[in-house]
Regions:
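Sec-dependent signal peptide recognition
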Residues: 2-10
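Solvent-exposed, flexible loop/coil residues
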Residues: 26-29, 37, 115, 125-126
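Bacterial Sec signal peptide processing site at the extreme N-terminus
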Residues: 11-34
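Compositionally biased, intrinsically disordered linkers/stalks adjacent to structured regions
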Residues: 26, 135-158
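N-terminal hydrophobic targeting signals that begin at the initiator methionine
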Residues: 1-2, 18
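Short extracytoplasmic
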Residues: 41-55
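Acidic/histidine-rich, surface-exposed loop or edge segments in extracytoplasmic proteins
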Residues: 30-41, 130
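Surface-exposed short loop/turn segments
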Residues: 52, 56, 61-66, 71-115, ...
Length: 158
């Protein structure tokens, strides 16, 4: 009986916790901007992920007088740094760092320049294929976090 009550209460609390996906269409409507031109340079993997995410942020359904139309130039840099080594000189920890340098233009006039950096420290793995796969996953996650910060800053531009 206690198990059923606990399960019911758990379901009740979790179903009404107010969770909303960050990238839902409802939340994207709050971003009153459209990206008319996107120039990317730097790390290819980061640029592909950025292009995939930023292409969804053009919102033509917003009234034209309220919509800001931006042109973006983004330079990306990805760096893998060895942070810790063991006694024999082998790397035990790495730091993956992604930096985005963003130039925002509106009507061919530069209105903002800013930089976004995301970092993650992780342990080495003896299996190189697993390590490479994990590093790619980390790079994608860091890119998503950095692009989220970029879109938040774009939404705040008046």
């Amino acid at each position: 009986m206690k198990k059923k009550i606990f399960t019911f209460l758990l379901f009740l609390f979790l179903s009404s916790c107010g969770y909303e996906a960050i990238y839902s269409l409802k939340n994207r409507a709050n971003y009153a901007f459209q990206i008319s031109k996107l120039e990317l340079s730097g790390d290819r993997q980061v640029n592909l992920k950025m292009k995939q995410i930023l292409s969804t942020y053009s919102n033509p359904n917003i009234a034209i007088e309220k919509r800001k139309i931006f042109e973006l130039k983004i330079s990306s840099d990805s760096e893998k740094i060895t942070t810790t080594k063991n006694a024999s000189g082998d790397a035990t920890k790495f730091k993956n760092e992604i930096t985005l340098k963003v130039q925002v233009s509106m009507d061919r006039t530069i209105i903002s320049n800013f930089s976004v950096t995301e970092k993650f420290i992780y342990n080495n793995n003896s299996n190189t294929s697993e390590l490479r796969s994990y590093e790619n996953q980390i790079k994608n996650n860091l890119t998503e976090a950095a692009v989220d910060k970029v879109t938040s800053k774009l939404a705040l531009i008046k």
